[in-house]
């Protein structure tokens, strides 16, 4: 193997460029710990707090979480399978659908997500560390950002290795914590089924599904170095169950903690984690918080890493760039700085802002995931001319009207069904009593339209181009060491 990053500790060089076969490495099972631990952190726990904090029963909240996780994780897992087959990071794969310039539409939204999540992540991490190790929250925000920056700069191999070790620790420590939940006293009526409220159920479902779908823009970034002979099925399963188990576990624990705290709920779950943990022994709550914060640091590094790839893709759309280590350092650093400024300037209403942000992510990426997956699995069936993706005048064009139009129409169809708390309630959502079913509208509209629009695409001709350019692509990629 002649990998540009053959062992943990060396700075990764590659970014948006194709990973040649000579540099492919890793086992498909590595995806399980990575996506388990990416979800097993405090921000995920906060997703499960939302409907409980609005008065829903624990039973219906947990059911909404389970359904939302099982549905939302499907999409991100299907995206993950693209990485080993194409050898490309996730968002650059949007060019065949949206065009060389047109893909900027979704890259802008993706970058907002990366930076936005890091604002929430570092605030939560800062509050958790301030609770356990004391000191100003903002100081801890800076420290956690710097640690995540170092991990992101070293890159792919360190991220995988760190997530594996953290997974082992999390299963043990959080397993003990979860068992403790069965032995604490809950308010009367906590486990009653309660009245089903469609708006609360769909609201929790939508936020959970949106959170899981939001990983779709990451997943190929962390599978693209794997050999192409790992099967799509295995890539899907390791990604799906790693993410679903980690995410579902944390969200359900969040809902249980909110139900246990009742009116004394602190708004983030940090205080409840600490208090319940101390039922094991004094100080165990601090151990749980520190470990959960390390999970936040790891996912913050993922956001910096993905944000860097998205920035480089955007720059490449206007001016052809040669991916280098220096370019990675600058773009990772800029992404870290941007989210740090946002975290230091953020307001106090964490849970309300986080809920609205998750809904925004869901709205923006439902049409994209439909377009991208229909293109990969149904239209082009995984056959792409990789070199043409980096050709500003190539066969995929500068503006992919099919993808752009399907996306915009799909998004527009969702607007009447939006329900974003006090910010906006669409007429259809209002007629449904506040139930937000935009997920079930945007996905089929965008997907079906894109399929119809692409009926005229000559996929056979594109495949011939891909086969003709394959050898040259490998040689060019190997020269970039």
Model-derived features: positions:
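Membrane-interface loop-to-helix entry segments
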Residues: 126, 139-181, 193-196, 237-242, ...
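Membrane-interface "cap" regions at the ends of multi-pass membrane proteins
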Residues: 1-58, 201-206, 224-234, 457-481
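Hydrophobic, membrane-embedded alpha-helices of multi-pass small-molecule transporters
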Residues: 26-45, 178-184, 193-259, 282-304, ...
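Selective recognition of specific alpha-helical transmembrane segments in multi-pass small-molecule
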Residues: 41-44, 67-75, 110, 114-119, ...
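C-terminal membrane-solvent junction of multi-pass transporters and transport-like membrane proteins
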Residues: 368-449
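Helix-loop-helix connectors at the membrane interface of multi-pass transporters/channels
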Residues: 91, 95, 123-140, 227, ...
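Loop-to-transmembrane helix boundary motifs in multi-pass membrane proteins
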Residues: 314-348, 395-414
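Transmembrane helix-loop boundary segments of multi-pass membrane transporters
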Residues: 52-63, 128-141, 157-166, 275-276, ...
